[in-house]
Every structure is written in structure tokens, then in C-alpha cells.
Regions:
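Hydrophobic, aromatic-rich transmembrane alpha-helices
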Residues: 162-166, 235-278, 285-289
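Membrane-embedded helix bundles of polyisoprenyl
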Residues: 20-22, 26-39, 44-135, 157-160, ...
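Membrane-interface coil-to-helix junctions
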Residues: 1-29, 52-62, 66-72, 194, ...
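Hydrophobic alpha-helical membrane-interfacial segments at the cytosolic entry of transmembrane helices
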Residues: 104-105, 128, 143-174, 185-196, ...
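Membrane-interfacial, low-structure loops and terminal tails that flank and connect transmembrane helices
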Residues: 90-94, 135-153, 254-276
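Transmembrane alpha-helices and membrane-interface helical segments
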Residues: 30-38, 77-85, 124-132, 241-252, ...
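Periplasmic/ER-lumenal interhelical loops and adjacent helix-loop junctions
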Residues: 169-253
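Membrane-helix boundary/interfacial segments in multi-pass membrane proteins
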Residues: 60-70, 189, 193-196, 216-233, ...
């Protein structure tokens, strides 16, 4: 839409494209900082660190060659709307406004980049399943609250569904015929672009800090030996980021379990929703890693390929690693 507006005013097509991409990057950086600082109440320093991990990562630099993937900069806006939906849940007017804004922003992401929309849906489904499992272990029956909301506000829920269907009809009218003709990939083609364990650290030979290590490991040599699309695998994380993530996994898990068992003994339920969401997000990131990783062609991504709608059209599934910079930035 911004590109079309610029072109309508006579801006050169290449300049219009560059302006939109730069604007996306700036907007993504600012909205991520706003999300971390204002919504998640993270300190200014760690909010800045989160922005760097998300918007100035090695993976972002590598993937900007595929300009559609810069739609990842829209994800913080989507999360802000979803967070605000729950934040103002008791206010009918604000809840409904943010509900429709959430649906609209996701639909716009679909129109901009199918990869980004698919990975967003996949992660949110993973997070929802993990969150329900964690909440159940806390004796916190979240589904009862969801069902109570649906029963009380069923007209609102129906309105969301109808609006969501209507707004994406043009997308699917265009996408489904093309997908049937050209989009479906064989699993054998996809698995060649799934990361091995070492690729979660593969920041490419062009990385100024760790590029020499990647070059020594000769990871690009797998193009000849295994037929792998090695240029798609350069979306790993730095040792510092991965180290922080692993540390926070154990630190947060220990803190969560201590508080959980104490609450279960005293109250019979652990109802700290903030901690439940945080630990669920950490678990979801590692579940996503497990789904992605492959060894000698064997990968749990096969279940995603078989069960998740639209998955056969995702040729370079390793790009999910790039999307995971969003939850990792929030966690760290």
C-alpha cells in the first residue's frame, strides 16, 4: 500500500521500493522497543538489546535480499494489538477495537508476505498449545475462562470470524489457484533446506565477528556433499544470543518451578499469568528449534508438512529461524 501511494505520486519505482523498505525497518525497530518497554515493562537497556536482536541481527542482514521477508517488521505491531486486546479486556469498546485491529494487521501481513504470515500462525499455534499444557500443569483451567468469554460475547466472536473471512477472501482467491499449480513442494526438496544442529549458530561467512569460524567449519561445502541449499541456512544466532537464551531457559524454569510448587501446596493453583506466558514462550522457542532441526534427512518438520495448512508451499522452512528472532528478542 505505501509503495502504491508513492508510485501514484510519481516516485521512481526503485526509489519507492527503497523508501518503503527503510520505513519498514525503522517502524519495526520503534514498535519493538515500544512493545518491550511499554507493554512488557522491560527496562530501557534490555528493550534496546531486544531491538538489536530483532532488527539488527545477522539473520535480518542476510534475509533482506528477499524483501518480502522484511514484513517481519510488522510483527511487533500485531503483538501490540493482541496484547492490548487482553490488557483492555474488561473494556468492551477497547477490546473490540483491538480485536479488529489484530485481525486486520495479520491479514495485511498475509497480503505482504505469505512466509511471514505462515510462520506467525505456526508460532502462535505452538505457543497456544504449550501455554495450555503449562496452565493445565498449574491447575489453572484457562479453557473455562475462554469458554465463558465465548458464551458471554458470542456475537462479538462471530463478528470477528465473519470479518476475518471477508478480509482474506481476495487473498485466497488469488493464492489458492497459484498454489495448486506452482506452490506445493515435495518434502524431499524442503528437507534439503532444514538446518542441522550446527546451523543454529550459522551466521554465514560474511559475519564480521564469527564469519571466520563458519569458514573454518566449511559449512558451505555441504552444497556439494549433501546437496543442501546452504545459502538459505545463514540465519543462525550468535553465540552470545544463544548463550543468553539457554541461560534464561534454566534460570526462568527454576524460578517458575519454585514458585509453582509453593503455590500448589498453599493454594492448590498457580495463577501467575505473566510467568506462565514467559515460560511458555521460552518452551515454544525450543519446541520450534526441535521441529526445524534435521539429521540425515530425518526431521519432525514432517509433521508440520503433513498437518499444518499451507506448509507444503514453504520451500525454505529454515527461514522460521529468522522469524524466531521476534520471541527471542521478547524473552531476552
Amino acid at each position: 500500500i505505501p509503495y502504491s501511494i508513492l508510485r501514484a505520486f510519481g516516485v521512481n519505482m526503485f526509489l519507492a521500493n527503497k523508501i518503503v523498505l527503510i520505513a519498514f525497518h525503522i517502524m519495526g525497530s520503534y514498535t519493538m522497543y515500544y512493545l518491550l518497554r511499554r507493554k512488557f515493562k522491560i527496562s530501557s537497556l534490555w528493550s534496546f538489546v531486544g531491538v538489536v536482536i530483532f532488527s539488527y541481527s545477522s539473520a535480518y542482514y542476510v534475509r533482506i535480499g528477499h524483501t518480502q521477508l522484511m514484513a517481519i517488521s510488522l510483527i511487533p505491531v500485531l503483538i501490540i494489538f493482541i496484547y492490548s486486546f487482553f490488557e483492555y479486556f474488561e473494556s468492551n469498546k477497547k477490546r473490540i477495537i483491538y480485536g479488529f485491529l489484530s485481525i486486520t494487521s495479520y491479514a495485511l501481513i498475509m497480503y505482504t508476505s505469505w512466509y511471514t504470515a505462515f510462520f506467525t500462525a505456526l508460532f502462535f499455534v505452538t505457543l497456544a498449545i504449550v501455554y495450555l499444557a503449562v496452565a493445565y500443569s498449574n491447575k489453572n483451567h484457562v479453557l473455562k475462562n475462554v469458554w465463558a468469554y465465548v458464551k458471554k460475547c458470542w456475537k462479538e466472536v462471530v463478528a470477528y470470524v465473519v470479518y476475518a473471512v471477508c478480509i482474506v477472501i481476495p487473498f485466497f482467491m488469488l493464492y489458492i489457484p497459484v498454489s495448486r499449480r506452482f506452490g506445493e513442494r515435495s518434502y524431499g526438496e524442503i528437507v534439503q533446506q532444514l538446518p542441522e544442529l550446527i546451523d543454529f549458530f550459522n551466521v554465514s561467512t560474511g559475519n564480521r565477528m564469527l564469519g571466520w569460524v563458519i569458514e573454518k567449519l566449511d559449512l558451505n561445502g555441504r552444497a556439494e556433499t549433501n546437496g543442501m541449499f546452504v545459502w538459505e541456512l545463514h540465519v543462525g544466532f550468535s553465540i552470545i544470543v544463544m548463550g543468553l537464551l539457554v541461560f534464561l531457559f534454566f534460570y526462568t524454569r527454576r524460578k517458575y518451578l519454585k514458585a509453582k510448587y509453593g503455590a500448589l501446596e498453599s493454594k492448590g493453583v498457580y495463577d501467575n499469568n505473566d510467568m506462565t506466558l514467559r515460560i511458555s514462550m521460552i518452551y515454544s522457542v525450543f519446541v520450534s528449534f526441535i521441529l526445524l532441526v534435521q539429521s540425515n534427512g530425518a526431521s519432525l518438520w514432517l509433521f508440520v508438512y503433513k498437518l499444518f495448512p499451507g506448509a507444503p508451499a514453504i520451500r525454505a522452512a529454515v527461514r522460521y529461524n529468522f522469524f524466531l528472532t521476534v520471541p527471542i528478542a521478547i524473552i531476552i
